[in-house]
Amino acid sequence: MSAERYINHPTFGMLYQVAPAGKGRDVYATLYAQKMFFLVTHQPRGAQFEVIPYLDARHHAEVHLTRCRREGSMDEQRWRELFQQTFI
């Protein structure tokens, strides 16, 4: 993955992708406002947004980092930097 992914929320505006969560879902965070995290399920007619707690979002990101490390993904460093910027 070389490009950042963004999605527009109808109320909170621009969100950026924090980590894939599996099964057609991704974790996104608000870009400009107070940090809020969403589990976004991509559907044929749009997206479903579910607000999730900070620790759940962090857990999804940690699981994804572990998977990248285990698989030797070339994108691990990029995801690690995003994790640091978002959660630390």
Annotate each PLM feature.
Residues 1-55:
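Long, non-catalytic architectural segments outside compact domain cores
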